[in-house]
Amino acid sequence: MKRTYQPHNKRRKRTHGFLVRMRTKGGRKVLKRRRLKGRKRLAV
């Protein structure tokens, strides 16, 4: 059986990247929360 996680950097950036997060209100909320939490990396 094939494993479910088949990593691809292009897909990773396109779905979880910083620019994608900035595009929607919800994504911006994600970044805001991660900033408040003090995450070293806000997005992929």
Curated annotation (Swiss-Prot):
Gene Ontology, cellular component aspect: ribonucleoprotein complex; ribosome
UniProt-recorded Gene Ontology molecular function terms: structural constituent of ribosome
Keyword Ribonucleoprotein: yes
GO annotation (BP), single: translation
Region of interest: Disordered: 25-44
Keywords assigned: Ribonucleoprotein, Ribosomal protein
Domain of life per record: Bacteria
InterPro entries: Ribosomal_bL34, Ribosomal_bL34_CS
Family, similarity comment: Belongs to the bacterial ribosomal protein bL34 family.
Protein name: Large ribosomal subunit protein bL34
Gene that encodes the chain: rpmH
